[in-house]
């Protein structure tokens, strides 16, 4: 099986602190890949490098056979743990703006937004400001914006924090459905039960190092 993502010997220093210590990963195409570890282990540092928010001090990242480059922003969907929506902008206006940053035309973005707003039964939110929404409502908008441009690789950092159980299950179902249609998923969490429920591959990150990587059932046997 070919890989959607390869991380090769990535090192990231933050002053005297080593955030990532020569970390290598292989994420198979079409997988749901769990990045498991406690808070502060280095998971978010790695995700920020994959998303080109920060650069590694050494090592490289290969996306779908190509060295990671600025144009790859259009094929990655990233939902950070700290959600980044502008609180005073209207929901619809903001969603259109973020979709166009990912390379979508306004017409395509409007069509996709109509589909997702109807699917999530939130058509009435279009003209609301983000600050008027509950945390769970804002999470739904962030998820829609993350997947709107139909990315090849979906990266979710603690995606269920802030959701009640009903909406968490709704988002889980959508992630699984997107994966069935061919989207590769990296799912970062500190919760083993979430990984066991959704993932077929896993890497355990601890104290800036990768401890283990492989198929979920193989890792559980070790």
Name what the model sees in each region.
Residues 217-221:
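Short acidic-hydrophobic catalytic motif
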Residues 5, 12-23, 27-206, 211-212:
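ABC transporter nucleotide-binding domains
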Residues 1-3:
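Primarily ABC-family ATPase nucleotide-binding module
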């Amino acid at each position: 099986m070919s890989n959607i993502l390869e991380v090769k010997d990535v090192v990231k220093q933050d002053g005297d602190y080593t955030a990532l210590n020569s970390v290598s990963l292989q994420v198979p195409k079409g997988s749901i890949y769990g990045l498991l570890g406690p808070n502060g282990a280095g998971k978010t540092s790695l995700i920020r490098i994959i998303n080109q928010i920060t650069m590694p001090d050494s090592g490289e990242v290969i996306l779908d056979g190509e060295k990671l480059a600025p144009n790859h922003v259009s094929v990655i969907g990233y939902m950070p743990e700290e959600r980044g929506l502008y609180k005073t902008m209207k929901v619809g206006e903001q969603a259109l703006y973020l979709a166009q940053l990912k390379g979508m035309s306004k017409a395509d973005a409007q069509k996709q937004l109509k589909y997702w707003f109807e699917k999530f039964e939130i058509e009435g939110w279009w003209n609301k400001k983000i600050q008027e929404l509950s945390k769970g409502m804002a999470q739904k908008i962030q998820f829609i914006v993350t997947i709107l441009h139909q990315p090849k690789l979906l990266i979710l950092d603690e995606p269920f924090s802030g959701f009640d159980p009903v909406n968490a299950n709704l988002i889980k179902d959508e992630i699984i459905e997107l994966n069935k249609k061919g989207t590769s998923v990296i799912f970062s969490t500190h919760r083993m039960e979430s990984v066991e429920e959704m993932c077929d591959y896993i890497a355990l990150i601890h104290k800036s190092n990768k401890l283990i990587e492989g198929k979920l059932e193989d890792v559980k046997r070790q």
